[in-house]
């Protein structure tokens, strides 16, 4: 069981496995996910897969956002090994493997290390090496040197077997026996799983993009050959409840032209306060998911303009968002969606009131059949809900017997199969196959970060990343008038209630204007069809010589009543404002920036040649000086060498002291 001291030679870290090379290549060819909204809640599933057999070792699902759903995953080592570890029969005690209980038990006491395959490091090898061709490639594991990393995405450690019969390092281990084979063994587990592992995500793993599966290699640390196991970690993101259409109009989800319906005059009926202090309301009954608002004042004869009506919608949404989530409104853009659907429904939970007598909101007359084409979320459902819409239900009630009326809380509505209404009759609901979902109604206003809007003004052809936009309903869904006042303190609740009611009034005014627009469009289409039919009949008869087409037909002349002139005027004003903004924006740009906007290829060309051009310019500027310095330095070195050579050929004379000599004298 003892292995050599770390490090070991890398020659023991290779083996032939052509199938794993192919799997490793396929992992790098996976398509990425679309960038999602960071605030959207999804059903996220993390999967650990054996790359050799393709069997899932673990699949953990939970609800959350893409930025915080990183659970701790538990799986067994034998689930990512399978039958790939088959020690030689000539090795009676290999100490590893998953085919026998004794080998599974001995494998528990063997250290292991894990190497990432997503790093694409050449020195670490490929799948045939377990991405651990040399020492230093390991980033996590259970060894005596405790490998760590500051850049890898996961950590893998040993766990503890479940149940009261746990394994220890010194003797018998019941969980290592498969209860399907050894049913009489005490403590036997399913599949003999006694090598639990714990996988956790690091901070880098939480920040990376899991747009495809990422692979790792696990190797046992033992004397001789270190066996290899390959596994991958992947994330699957699914919406909890995809938006579904609610209402009798089956063509609106596809946004096709509406079918011609009978012209019904819009009638707004103000309701007097109830005995319990209720506020007047305006309701729409038997409408195809007709958007309406509950606590509003009676309609004024004078209708506000389109611009003011749209501004009130955005302003009411901003005030509500500012009160409930002020951090989101410090620097943001709220954009009103100009294409259908203009409203969306969010299914919520709430406490409705049960009344024996019909309230005033149930006595209104049907109006135009407006339909909300998107209902998402999970909320309270009444009656028998078909399987196609059960995803919208978090709680389902069968309703009540008898003649009862269920009134939705303030700020919410019953989205039924036959239309949107503030109250429902149980007698009608029990008699028909209708069903209802408690919903909130929100205008489709998207929330954008400031960088997204600025990029449009700068006319950038591309973005660094896909823009993230979400509707305000996703940020404020479930915040009703009653819910805000119930879940917060009294003063704050009253303030938020006032903001929410202001938004509701703006929505109601906008919906009434939409109804009037639909009526005007119906009249315009009817008038146009009459003109077309009359011209066709006149052209067939060709009685123009008798005084004209109308005289020949002996009927009143029909003329096209154009009720869309205001639309054309508004569009002309809009184009004029856009042109003025574009001129103002162009005047604030310099010439170089204008070149970049007019020629998209100019940016690519400049960025490609700028580097070599700068290098060439630096060489021309500083090249002569550097060359002179280099030549002077070489000359100095050569001069020193010549001086040394000449010095070695001569010997320096010493300083000898010269004494005076006395010449001999002769005596005469």
Curated annotation (Swiss-Prot):
Residues bearing glycans: 43, 58, 286, 322, 327, 351, 354, 394, 410, 430
Q: Which residues lie on this side of the membrane: Cytoplasmic?
A: 627-668
Q: What gene codes for this chain?
A: env
- Sequence segments annotated as region (Fusion peptide): 467-487
According to the record, the segments passing through the membrane are 606-626
Where can the motif CXXC be found? 332-335
Pfam families per the UniProt record, alphabetical: TLV_coat
Please identify the protein, giving its name as recorded: Envelope glycoprotein
Say where the lipid (S-palmitoyl cysteine) is covalently attached: 625
Oligomeric and partner information = The mature envelope protein (Env) consists of a trimer of SU-TM heterodimers attached by a labile interchain disulfide bond.
In its UniProt entry, the species of origin is given as: Feline leukemia virus (isolate CFE-6)
Give yes or no: UniProt keyword Lyase: no
Coiled coil stretches, renumbered: 495-544, 554-590
Top-level taxonomy: Viruses, Riboviria, Pararnavirae, Artverviricota, Revtraviricetes
